[in-house]
Amino acid sequence: MLKKSTNIKKGSIIFFEHTSKILKGNLLGDPHIRTFPVYIPWQYHSARNKNRKFPVLFDLAGFTGSGLGRVNWKNFEESVPERIDRLIHQQKLKPFIIVFPDCFTSLGGNQYINSSAIGRYADYLTLELIPHIDSELRSLASREHRGCLGKSSGGYGALIHGMKYTKFWGAIGSHSGDAYFDFVY
């Protein structure tokens, strides 16, 4: 088991339940009410930061993964929130909010695109979740302070969003993004 640092300030995970108009009635019959976690850095709740706004990063899970899975405990490595806490503590990162969207489908996931067969997940992220986060949290609500990253299918989604939805994203990261999904849909 990985020995984890206990002497650093930790952020918190809050859960949002969002009712999507865009995902309602999708052909797969997947839920349109989604619960997803959001990482909040400890500085967000600090009294001296009560008016401070924070950049936001959307973390897109890979195929068969979910936003909920991205915040889980890991036995031999740091979870995403643990890693972010450590890097903020070491001053290698500045504090920011991380959104872990729930875009899981009955097929095991998606590529965060709009699909007549699976659902309009690009629109769900850009037209519903971004405004929801910006209205509920003290976020820096502009593309210059918003990023999107992912691994595998999430990496593909991040690349597509970086190319097709540039008015929403100021930074993109893709780790092993799969490709050729546009030929499948």
Question: How would you label these PLM feature ranges?
Answer:
Residues 1-185:
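Non-catalytic cap/lid and distal C-terminal segments of serine-dependent acyl enzymes
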